[in-house]
């Protein structure tokens, strides 16, 4: 086996920048990602617009999910968003692209949502057929639903423990 000569990170990056096949691969990947995001961009804009009308400056439903301060990552939105819970509950009941639906569910994965939030999550959990989203809902219920209520529904624990692989 031939040994390779050590390469610095800078030299590696320069070699990738000069490699037309590598650059073509990244252009193709970027186009695929843009096409994927375009599938649900209108839905995300609709939710963001409704949130802005409530006073929350977000550009995506995922801004509610990733809303805690971070020392390195820049956050579009930081802070509580209780006034958005009713709007998010409404969107939970509207058919959305899977990526948006997951963002809505994760945005409702809150301890302070009270019964309105966990009842809506439970209703969707019982209705959901996608095992991956059932896991996301079970995770949300584990956070949002009081334990004394959650123990009445062993299927939540089963879905959570399955990791979405039921």
How does the language model describe each region?
Residues 4-10, 34-50, 79-94, 113-127, ...:
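Amphipathic alpha-helical scaffolding segments comprising HEAT/armadillo-like alpha-solenoid repeats
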Residues 61, 72-76, 87-95, 105-109, ...:
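Short secondary-structure capping micro-motifs at structural edges
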Residues 61-65, 89, 104-105, 122, ...:
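Hydrophobic core positions within HEAT/HEAT-like alpha-solenoid repeats
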Residues 69-81, 108-112, 141-148:
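Alpha-solenoid repeat junctions
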Residues 96-97, 128-130, 160-165:
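Short inter-helical turns and helix N-cap capping residues of alpha-solenoid HEAT/ARM repeat scaffolds
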């Amino acid at each position: 086996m031939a040994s390779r000569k050590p390469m610095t990170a800078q030299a590696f990056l320069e070699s990738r920048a000069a490699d037309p096949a590598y650059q073509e691969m990244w252009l193709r990947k970027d186009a695929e990602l843009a096409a994927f995001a375009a599938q649900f961009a209108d839905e995300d804009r609709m939710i963001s617009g409704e949130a802005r009308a409530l006073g929350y400056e977000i550009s995506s439903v995922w801004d509610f999910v990733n809303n805690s301060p971070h020392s390195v990552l820049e956050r579009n939105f930081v802070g509580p968003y209780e006034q958005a819970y009713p709007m998010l509950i409404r969107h939970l009941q509207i058919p959305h692209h899977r990526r948006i639906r997951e963002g809505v569910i994760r945005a409702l994965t809150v301890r302070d949502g009270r019964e309105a939030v966990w009842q809506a999550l439970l209703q969707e959990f019982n209705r959901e057929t996608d095992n991956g989203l059932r896991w996301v809902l079970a995770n949300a219920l584990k956070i949002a639903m009081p334990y004394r209520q959650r123990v009445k529904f062993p299927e939540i624990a089963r879905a959570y423990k399955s990791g979405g692989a039921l």
